[in-house]
Amino acid sequence: MVNIGILALQGDVAEHVRALEESGARAVLVRRSEELASVDGLVIPGGESTTMSNLLLSFGIFDSLAEQISNGMPVYGTCAGMIMLATTILDGRDDQRSFGAIDMVVRRNAFGRQVDSYEEELDIKGIEGKPFPAVFIRAPWVESVGESVDVLARAGNAHDGPIVAVRSGQALATSFHPEIGTDWRFHELFTRMVQRES
């Protein structure tokens, strides 16, 4: 069984624990850089991306995590976690840092405010079966991607709709929250990615 860490500084930590355990992984809460040594992959949950960036720096974990990610540790970012994996952040703060794990330009809060949150059924490239129930909460979207990035889903299932799920090598990101609900297919996909690397 693989150990998958969840960055436990803010966000839907308990929901990710449940989703990973239902997907056959052992979930490990990560709050300090030394805890990274005990995990085979890491989930960066939603929350508020500028706060998350500041907490990572305050807790002294940013540089260690950046090194692990650049060395190929599988990583999955949801919502604010997607922002943290981007090479470029639009509408972010000047001092906001990201890991640059996925060659993409992400716009913060692109879908609007909390009141604009919604759910839709998405067709996901690489995930079989019925459409995936995607919950968007003050979500970002991807404005553009580099050639190495595989687009997995677009809002509205439209050919030219905003990009909301991507994969690049060992990095996976969604602008929505798959940990909400009981459909574990994204966490199962990530667990398989981690199993292949460990």
Q: Language-model features: where?
A:
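Short coil/turn connectors at secondary-structure junctions
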Residues: 1, 39, 71-73, 96-97, ...
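Hydrophobic anchor at the start of a short beta-strand
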Residues: 27-28, 75, 171
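Redox-cofactor binding/interface segments in oxidoreductases and associated redox assembly factors
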Residues: 44, 77, 174
